[in-house]
Swiss-Prot record:
Record's protein name: Probable GTP-binding protein EngB
Lineage summary: Bacteria, Pseudomonadati, Pseudomonadota, Betaproteobacteria, Burkholderiales
UniProt xrefs under Pfam families: MMR_HSR1
Cofactor: Mg(2+)
Gene label: engB
Residues annotated to bind Mg(2+): S38, T60
UniProt keyword annotation of Nucleus present: no
Limits of the EngB-type G domain: 23-211
PROSITE patterns in the record: G_ENGB
InterPro entries from the UniProt entry: G_ENGB_dom, GTP-bd, GTP-bd_ribosome_bio_YsxC, P-loop_NTPase
Swiss-Prot/TrEMBL GO biological process terms: division septum assembly
Assigned GO CC terms: cytosol
Family designation: Belongs to the TRAFAC class TrmE-Era-EngA-EngB-Septin-like GTPase superfamily. EngB GTPase family.
Paired cysteines (S-S): none
Entry keywords, A to Z: Cell cycle, Cell division, GTP-binding, Magnesium, Metal-binding, Nucleotide-binding, Septation
């Protein structure tokens, strides 16, 4: 059983000054409104309504923290960031979201990686690129889940994944000529509905959150 199955709601904040004052590792989930972020969180944690998928895009305006527990011991956090890209949101709200997201992604020391949910049918959008550009300078990993891949046929899935991986090369400072396989920015196919790619995503998130712990266990054994 995955450690993510033990996730439960911890807190919600609307300002970076209110973020939990703990040294625990965090993995952030980001994505456009309606890209399938809440569904991805729910299926990865094997829960139906851990993250609330609003029928009104852009409604979630806070950073939601979900703690991963072992009985009553808090081990780490999954962090649900506000969805972005919904046109009906007013300018003031958009400005607040941008400031909140950029500050969190660029300055949060406890953040060890970002899972970016991208609709496989749309590919990486300009706003997705903005998220990547905010986060890449930290040197921390970004993993893209190409969601709703069940809506594409096998050939379309292959091309969608190839296109995104090629696009990611240009953002990796370790690949100055824009070629080669990026280690910092990775991508996979994913479907919450058909449960495609769950194991791959789960393994990576667990690695980010508990890699040091696993290494220490190997040393002591």
């Amino acid at each position: 059983m995955s450690k993510l199955f033990q996730a439960r709601f911890a807190t919600t904040v609307n300002d970076t000054h209110c973020l939990p004052a703990t040294p625990l590792r965090e993995v952030a989930f980001a994505g456009r409104s309606n890209a399938g972020k809440s569904s991805a969180l729910n299926v990865l944690c094997n829960q139906k309504r851990l993250a609330f998928a609003s029928k009104t895009p852009g409604r979630t305006q806070h950073i939601n923290y979900f703690g991963i527990f072992a009985k009553d011991d808090l081990l780490a956090y999954l962090v649900d960031l506000p969805g972005y890209g919904y046109a009906a949101v007013n300018h003031e709200t958009k400005y607040h979201w941008n400031a909140l997201l950029s500050d969190y992604l660029q300055e949060r020391e406890q953040l060890v990686g970002m899972v970016l949910i991208v609709d496989a049918r749309r590919g990486i959008t300009e706003l997705d690129e903005q998220m990547i550009q905010w986060f890449v300078p930290t040197g921390k990993p970004i993993h893209i889940l190409l969601s709703k891949c069940d809506k594409l046929n096998k050939s379309e899935c292959k091309h969608a994944l190839e296109d995104v991986r090629k696009q990611l090369q240009q953002y990796d400072p370790a690949l100055p000529d824009g070629t080669g396989e990026s280690q910092q920015l990775t991508a996979q196919l994913f479907s919450s509905t058909k449960r495609i790619g769950l194991e791959e995503a789960d393994n990576l998130i667990i690695k980010w959150l508990f890699e040091a712990e696993t290494h220490e266990d190997e040393i002591t054994s």
